[in-house]
């Protein structure tokens, strides 16, 4: 059994039920870790509704209202650090709130116990844009399992954030799947226009591009088969996977 840490804000509310349902198929120690404010300083008022509605014996919540973490990277790292203390197993899967595993496939992968041989393991993922049935033909990477004993504060608070978990040791595996089947699904940009605007206002890549203009142009028309983030090509799914 592994613990699961989910970095969450109410910007990811539409994914929350699915990620909890899927993670519950392979873990009984799920920690949802949040900051009381978005990265732009606005109070995350949506947390109260989620916590009061969703808290159960298998899901714990850690909410930090201290405003201790000032930089974007420290905020990301701090959310994970706060949750580690609540994890009861020797291995922890770190997810963002829009990274949803196929719970049945993950359970089968974990039952092999190959991950126990390594300090860290990451996963291939499908990547989606605008709607959950627009899936990029290019694979990406998300989700990292790490041995808990490695997770000192110096280790967690690193410039590379959670990807430091695979960068600082030679004993890791990247881009894992189960018998060729992709386990992880990243719905980062599956959002309405308003949700995308909220996302780019309060995340660590705010200054990378003129996101507002790109979003306005994107929603001035139907989806044209390419995203403005990576420029991937897409397939249209007949049914939503998770």
For the regions a language model picked out, list residue spans one by one:
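Cell-envelope/extracellular polymer assembly enzymes that use nucleotide-activated donors
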Residues: 1-5, 29
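Active-site-proximal specificity loops/subdomain of glycosyltransferases
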Residues: 35-91
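Active-site acidic Asp-centered loop
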Residues: 35, 95-96, 122
């Amino acid at each position: 059994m592994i613990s699961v840490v989910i970095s969450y804000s109410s910007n990811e509310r539409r994914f929350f039920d699915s990620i909890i349902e899927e993670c519950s198929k392979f873990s009984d120690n799920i920690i949802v870790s949040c900051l009381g404010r978005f990265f732009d300083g606005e109070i995350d008022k949506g947390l109260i509704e989620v916590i009061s509605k969703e808290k159960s014996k298998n899901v714990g919540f850690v909410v930090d209202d201290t405003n201790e973490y000032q930089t974007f990277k420290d905020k990301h790292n701090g959310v994970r650090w706060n949750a580690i203390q609540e994890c009861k197993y020797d291995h922890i899967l770190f997810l963002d709130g829009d990274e949803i595993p196929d719970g049945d496939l993950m359970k089968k992968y974990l039952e092999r116990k190959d991950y126990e041989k390594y300090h860290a393991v990451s996963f291939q993922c499908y990547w989606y844009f605008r709607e959950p049935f627009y899936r990029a033909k290019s694979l990406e990477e998300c989700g990292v399992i790490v041995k808990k004993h490695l997770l000192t504060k110096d280790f967690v608070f690193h410039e590379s954030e959670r990807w430091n978990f695979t960068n600082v040791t030679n004993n890791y595996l990247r881009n894992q799947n189960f018998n060729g089947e992709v386990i992880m699904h990243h719905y980062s940009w599956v959002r309405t226009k308003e949700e995308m605007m909220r996302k780019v206002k309060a995340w660590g890549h705010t200054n990378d591009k003129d996101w507002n203009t790109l979003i306005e142009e994107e929603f001035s028309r139907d989806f044209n088969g390419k995203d403005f983030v990576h420029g991937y090509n897409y397939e249209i799914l007949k049914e939503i996977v998770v």
